[in-house]
Structures are given as C-alpha cells and as structure tokens.
Amino acid sequence: FQYVSTTTKVPPPDMTSFPYGTRRSPAKIWPTTKRPAITPANNPKHSKDPHKTGPEDTTVLIETKRDYSTELSVTIAVGASLLFLNILAFAALYYKKDKRRHETHRRPSPQRNTTNDIAHIQNEEIMSLQMKQLEHDHECESLQAHDTLRLTCPPDYTLTLRRSPDDIPLMTPNTITMIPNTLTGMQPLHTFNTFSGGQNSTNLPHGHSTTRV
C-alpha cells in the first residue's frame, strides 16, 4: 500500500472544521494522514469475490434475458399461428360436411321423379311386350287355322294320276306279276276302285302304257 503523509497547519482550538484532526493535548498536536482511493484492480477482495458483479456484467445479463424473451415470443407466435391454421382447416372440413348433408337432404325429390320415370318406362316396355305377344299369338292361330284347312281338304287324286312319267318309277316284270296278288289283298282298302280283281293288269292306269286303240 502506498501511504502519503501530509502536514497541515494547526487550527485554533475553537474551530472544528477538520473532524479528522485529533488533539490530545493543547501543547502537542499530531499531524493527520489521508489514504488514497483504492482502485478496483488493486482490491484483492473484489478479485476474490466472484458473486459480486460490476455494471458491465449486469448489462450482459440483461441482454441475454432479452434474447431469450425474443425467442420465446417468436415460438409462441409460431405456435399460435399453427393453431389458428388448424382451427381454420377443421372449420373448412366441417363446413363441407354440413354442405353435403344439406345437399343429400335436398336430393330425394329428384330421385322420386327418376323412380317415377323408370316405372313409367317399365310399364311402356311391358305394354309393348304384351302387344308383340298378342300379335305373335294371332299369327300362330292364323297359321294353325290354315294348316287345319289344308288337312281337312281331300287329296286330289287326279293330280297324282296326271303326274309326269318321270315321277313314277318304272315297274320291273317281277313287280308286274305280283300286282294281281297285291290287288286282291288291297281291294277292301280302295273302295273307290271299280275294277274287279280278275281283270288284266293292263287296265291299270300307268304312265307309259303301250296299248293302242
């Protein structure tokens, strides 16, 4: 430590302007000394005490606190914006669902109209099918009546007799000799034959007769 000693004049006994002055006896007065101001760098207690901080340290701490507060405010703002966006998305989905429900409640009337149209079309198709069936039945009845008329009419034997010689097969001598026997057996079947069984077979009509008048 540096101590600086200074000498001062002795004040009168009545004046006490210097409180640091001491007087033990009125005869002898000791001089007073002053200590210089100690700087923080020369103070060992200040260097040894880590808890005590100066004004610069306090400003640094305040600045770091402000940085954390800004980061916190930014994160809170981002979270709030995301939450707001989620709420908007859910509201949009709910609105779409509600709109679809209203549309489904309004649609049954046109569906009824379509069902009526379908029923009308089906009725028309059924009527057309019934008409076609009746026409087909009528055509079948007319064809059946025509067939019955053709069956009830007697066969035209003159047409069979007037057939061309090509239609009738030629008779061999063996079949000619067998004709009288077959005629006797078939006589009761042909009631329209006026010829007797004993006549010659040359009287039978055939396509290529060789008799001449």
From Swiss-Prot:
Biased composition (Basic and acidic residues): 46-55
InterPro entries per the UniProt record, alphabetical: Neuroligin/BSAL
Annotated segments matching region Disordered: 1-56
One Gene Ontology biological process: cell adhesion
One GO cellular component, as annotated: postsynaptic density membrane
Membrane topology listed for this record: Single-pass type I membrane protein
Predominant place of localization: membrane
Location within or outside the cell: Cell membrane; Postsynaptic density membrane
Cytoplasmic side: 95-213
Subunit structure: Homodimer. Interacts with NRXN1 in a calcium-dependent manner. Interaction with neurexins is mediated by heparan sulfate glycan modification on neurexin. Interacts through its C-terminus with DLG4/PSD-95 third PDZ domain.
Record's function text: Cell surface protein involved in cell-cell-interactions via its interactions with neurexin family members.
Name by which UniProt lists this protein: Neuroligin-4, X-linked
Protein's organism: Macaca mulatta
Gene: NLGN4X
